[in-house]
Amino acid sequence: MARTASSNSTKPRKSKDNGSTHDGETKVQPELDLEPEPLWKKILLAIPRAFGSGVRAVTGVGEYDPAYRRDGLCFLLLVLAVLFCASEWFRVSGPFGQLLHAIAAGVLGLMSVVLPVLLAAVAFRLMRNSGKGSNNPRVVTGWVLLMWSICSIIDVAIAADHTGFDITILQSAGGLFGFFLGSPLAWGLSNVFAIIIFVVVGLFSLLMITGTHVTDLPEDARKIAAKIQRKPYVPMGQETDGSASQFPNEVRVGDTTLAFADGVPSHDGDDDGSDNDQAGDARPSLFARLFGRKSKTEDDKTLDKYAADDPFDRAASQHGATAETPVVDPMTGEIIGARTIASSSYDGRPHLSSPAPAADADDGDASRTRVITSGQTVAMPGGGAVDDPWAPSAAQAGTVALAGAAGAMGAAGAAGAAAAAAATGAYAGADADGSGVGQGVPNTGGQPNATAGNDTDDDANRPYQLPDLNLLTKGQPHAMRTPANDRVIRALTSTFEQFNVDAKVVGFLRGPSVTQYEVELGPGVKVEKVTNLQRNIAYAVASSDVRILSPIPGKSAIGIEIPNEDREIVHLGDVLRSDKAVGDPNPMLSGIGKDVEGHFVTADLTKMPHLLVAGATGSGKSSFINSMLTSIIMRATPEQVRLIMVDPKRVELSAYAGIPHLLTPIITDPKKAAQALEWVVKEMDARYSDLEFFGFRHVKDFNEAVRAGKVHAPAGSQRKVAPYPYILVVVDEMADLMMVAKNDVESSIQRITQLARAAGVHLVLATQRPSVDVVTGLIKANIPSRLAFATSSATDSRVILDTVGAETLIGQGDALFLPMGSAKPIRVQGSWVSESEIRKAVEFVRTQRKPKYREDIEQMAKEAEKKDSMEPDEEIGDDMDVLLQAAELVVTSQFGSTSMLQRKLRVGFAKAGRLMDLLESRGVVGPSEGSKAREVLVQPQDLPQVLAFIRGETSSLEATAPQQPELGE
């Protein structure tokens, strides 16, 4: 053990640079740390020194070297950090853990959870920055002021209304730190002004911690803006300096000037290239000022080493190790991230975090291999194991090749970049099947295919890659408790006391939009005493949207659901990234949102098996449809799920036009929608015929048997047996379809909902008018799963859910979800996906494949339209011949009289009047003018067009106007 005889002598530490130095370097011997210790260090070292003095008095040994004392202090702080971590984070229930929690919470209150982090940060800083010239006192003082201000703000916000000294309240507020300063200021001034003062103190403490002066804030803001915009940083006052723009890669050190070639980094190592100013003027970053080593003095850095060698040494150190290669978004061309590639084993293939398996030359079913963005590969129908999961497709290799060359240029210079570019170019030129024919870069325009097209051979052989879940926005963390919840609890308790109801609030569950408060009743208290107070409770909490559950399912308590003052947005990306969604590989899984407990809610459309969605305008119905469709796009390939979208509004689902999952272009005509539903019925019957022939009860079992090679076509048949994809039919507005073709639509929906579950066909119906003429009894009886958003009346709520409750929802995604098999609906906050997120996901799948439409659907629509045009109008009935004669008489005579039709056609007055009304509805004559004859609207030369229109041979009456003589002849 290394010790010294007395505390006045110190042992010099070894220099960290034990190897040979570069030519021209000057070694500087470390100076002795004889500076008096600051006060904060004496306080921290008081207990260890007292313990050490006692040990030395007993053993008679000398004092440790100051360097070892400093190391001992650092490890003591780390031990304390571990102990407080056990008590504050993991809630160790032992006596020692309770004592530590009492100390930490009593001093810091709620901020005791950050105490382990602070202790570890102080220990880390003492290890790296100590001794002469250290700025540790300033940093520690700044942290103390920051903690004091935060604790005071918490004390004023939570415990200011409580009088007296109660340690239990202080532990759940700001602790002693906040009480000694927060309570006096709140009592002397007010809560608002006290918080303002503490905010100012907190800002000042941040300046102390970072070592930033107020005059440096504009310069720091310019640096941050330059990094965000990815532009070179130009100091204030040097914007018009011509030398900087003429030599952007020039480095000046003393009297030495060296200009580097383009592509070689000439700054201090930052990848953004924003710190290319002079070395003497550059200020350290925020992280360096907090945790970096102590900077050298001006005398030490002038002769340290030849500064022009730094970029070359850095490039040489990266060669053979790792290099950061940017990954380019194939849709926008922007750099979306960086992946580490080993330079020594670089083979020209970019290593992506979301690998795309290469198509094997000997495997014809490689197009059925599904690539999960997390790196997991799942074999699709007929596909085998992927040999090389890191090999990208030809289009991806062509896109990422430029990124790989750029990363190699920044790491190993121009020569290494040329070699890397040659390697990636050779790989990108190879076809997926090994033919060596370059595929080029796919079209990234994002324009959907306007006409029905088929997949090309390149699309069929190219592996399909699912979009990365990182395309979807991440939301804010869920708040478990806010001051608003405490105010509501006090209001509920006061209401029960005012009406002499023996009930108390025992807990609450905070959701994103509403909070459910659990109320327990005393002995002998009826539930009706609380439910009858609904209006009084709404008055007490200042909210009209109060919903009471009596009781809460599975609990002996009454639930009072009250909207939150500070609502949270549930992002679809958070739902799909949750453990519940990631652990379920079902491609038909859809993200619903969050329940009142803050848990993520998902729905498997194959188990629902059909869904009815209803809600008033602005309630969040369209947002749910977008979330459901985006979930399908993010999780399913076109081989797994095919979509039929019906959008009578023409604009709600237009963003999904051209995606490869579509079976037909988005249908906007209600008549064509009825024909599409009839096609779905025929497809369902065909699937049931296959299931019956091959002996399966569900399409899922049939698909598994096909993938396993257990199902084969009959001998002599030319058919190729392939797995059936799920078919999802989405109708955005049910009311428009029921108005145009109610009988056909209702019968088709009835057959689909009754039989289509085992065939893999599922239906989602949405409407904003949930009346009995739209959601009929036949439709509702076969759709067990319901999702009700805010409705305008309790009657509409009963139509959807068969119970009231939807009329009390607050809108904007607040919904009641009743899945199949559930006794009572679940209140959820629907997930939200923005238009930009939808556009990114849609463009990602568009660039991989073109939609492959079913031609028989369009053919059925054309045949039905032709058949309707050939059939006589039901309004005319058997009077077609008489009507044609009446039209000929009226047009040729230019006299629209009912009495003339009576005489000429020998019909009664009632039938003559009916014929005249039919001619008026078809634009032949004008409206009735009393006893006068009606005006004839067409000319005699237009008689053939009129007769053809009445027969139904043309779609419109095209009357030719008389030609005007040309002037100027």
Curated annotation (Swiss-Prot):
Domain FtsK: 598-798
Annotated Polar residues bias: 1-10
Topological domain ranges for the Cytoplasmic compartment: 213-969
Regions crossing the membrane: 72-92, 102-122, 139-159, 169-189, 192-212
Function in brief: Essential cell division protein that coordinates cell division and chromosome segregation. The N-terminus is involved in assembly of the cell-division machinery. The C-terminus functions as a DNA motor that moves dsDNA in an ATP-dependent manner towards the dif recombination site, which is located within the replication terminus region. Required for activation of the Xer recombinase, allowing activation of chromosome unlinking by recombination.
CDD domains: TrwB_TraG_TraD_VirD4
Gene of this entry: ftsK
A Pfam short name: FtsK_gamma
Biased composition (Basic and acidic residues): 15-30
Subcellular location, principal: membrane
Segments for region (Disordered): 1-31, 260-291, 311-367, 438-468
Taxonomic placement: Bacteria, Bacillati, Actinomycetota, Actinomycetes, Bifidobacteriales
Identification of the protein by name: DNA translocase FtsK
Record remark: domains: Consists of an N-terminal domain, which is sufficient for the localization to the septal ring and is required for cell division, followed by a linker domain, and a C-terminal domain, which forms the translocation motor involved in chromosome segregation. The C-terminal domain can be further subdivided into alpha, beta and gamma subdomains. The alpha and beta subdomains form the DNA pump, and the gamma subdomain is a regulatory subdomain.
Subunit structure: Homohexamer. Forms a ring that surrounds DNA.
Binding-site residues for ATP, renumbered to this chain: G618, S619, G620, K621, S622, S623
Single GO MF annotation: ATP hydrolysis activity
Keywords, in A-Z order: ATP-binding, Cell cycle, Cell division, Cell membrane, Chromosome partition, DNA-binding, Membrane, Nucleotide-binding, Transmembrane, Transmembrane helix
SUPFAM superfamilies reported for this sequence: P-loop containing nucleoside triphosphate hydrolases, Winged helix' DNA-binding domain
Topology versus the membrane: Multi-pass membrane protein
Similarity section: Belongs to the FtsK/SpoIIIE/SftA family.
